[in-house]
UniProtKB/Swiss-Prot annotation:
It comes from the Eukaryota. Component of the mitochondrial large ribosomal subunit (mt-LSU). Mature mammalian 55S mitochondrial ribosomes consist of a small (28S) and a large (39S) subunit. The 28S small subunit contains a 12S ribosomal RNA (12S mt-rRNA) and 30 different proteins. The 39S large subunit contains a 16S rRNA (16S mt-rRNA), a copy of mitochondrial valine transfer RNA (mt-tRNA(Val)), which plays an integral structural role, and 52 different proteins. One of its GO terms (molecular function) is structural constituent of ribosome. InterPro entries: MRP-L47_sf, Ribosomal_uL29_mit. GO terms for biological process: mitochondrial translation. The gene is MRPL47. It is found in: Mitochondrion. This is Large ribosomal subunit protein uL29m. Gene3D superfamilies: 6.10.330.20. The modification N6-acetyllysine is found at residue 144. GO terms for cellular component: mitochondrial inner membrane; mitochondrial large ribosomal subunit; mitochondrion. Keywords: Acetylation, Mitochondrion, Ribonucleoprotein, Ribosomal protein, Transit peptide. The lineage of its organism: Eukaryota, Metazoa, Chordata, Craniata, Vertebrata. Belongs to the universal ribosomal protein uL29 family. It comes from Homo sapiens.
Length: 250
């Protein structure tokens, strides 16, 4: 009885394997039991399993396309762009928004610099070069707003105007400089390196300081005279603008 039961079980297993082989195409290798264990029990379309690719052949750009302009703008002479961000607009935003906006502007700047370099290489005019100036102005305004917030927070917490404490001192050439304080391991009266610094000027330096002040005054006066001459030339060249300016003042 045991032998008959074992033979009946073997026949059922062999019939089940034959029926499973009939469902799979001839491309399946001999070890069909391994593949059948990976598939779900209810697989109406088993032939689609062999259509999958084991190797992914798409291009791995890794974000390099962000260094190039939108393909829609390729070949165009002018590209529309908005105005630059102002400090007043950026002051109304949170720190998180400013952080995100900084990286957006940085990516845009890298893209425009790549476009500018490629235009130089091909000896072609860059489409809408004012976009780069707007991005640079926006980044400068954002940096200024962040610096204002850091200064305000530091004044509130420590009362210091500068990030690193210091004092106005005079060097050996008589110039007034901002000396930044630094932490030392040993006291100042035992520190030879600190004692070599001279925060005073000898009397013979006063003559050269006077010459330097005279030089700065001459440069300033020369610049003002040049601006006045340019203004007179423009008034003679465009008299209607002078009349319009006088009427607006009245």
């Amino acid at each position: 009885m045991a032998a008959a039961g074992l033979a009946l079980l073997c026949r059922r297993v062999s019939s089940a394997l034959k029926s499973s082989r009939s469902l799979i195409t001839p491309q399946v290798p001999a070890c069909t039991g391994f593949f059948l264990s990976l598939l779900p029990k209810s697989t109406p379309n088993v032939t689609s399993f062999h259509q999958y690719r084991l190797l992914h052949t798409t291009l791995s750009r890794k974000g390099l396309e962000e260094f190039f302009d939108d393909p829609k703008n390729w070949g165009q002479e002018k590209v529309k762009s908005g105005a630059a961000w102002t400090c007043q607009q950026l002051r109304n935003k949170s720190n998180e928004d400013l952080h995100k906006l900084w990286y957006v502007l940085l990516k845009e700047r890298n893209m425009l610099l790549t476009l500018e370099q490629e235009a130089k290489r091909q000896r072609l005019p860059m489409p809408s070069p004012e976009r780069l100036d707007k991005v640079v102005d926006s980044m400068d305004a954002l940096d200024k707003v962040v610096q204002e917030r850091e200064d305000a927070l530091r004044l509130l917490q420590t009362g210091q105007e500068r990030a690193r404490p210091g004092a106005w001192r005079r060097d050996i050439f008589g110039r007034i400089i901002w000396h930044k304080f630094k932490q030392w391991v040993i006291p100042w009266h035992l520190n030879k390196r600190y004692n070599r610094k001279r925060f005073f000027a000898l009397p013979y330096v006063d003559h050269f300081l006077r010459l330097e002040r005279e030089k700065r005054a001459r440069i300033k006066a020369r610049k003002e005279n040049l601006e006045r001459k340019k203004a007179k030339i423009l008034l003679k060249k465009f008299p209607h603008l002078a009349e319009a300016q006088k009427s607006s003042l009245v």
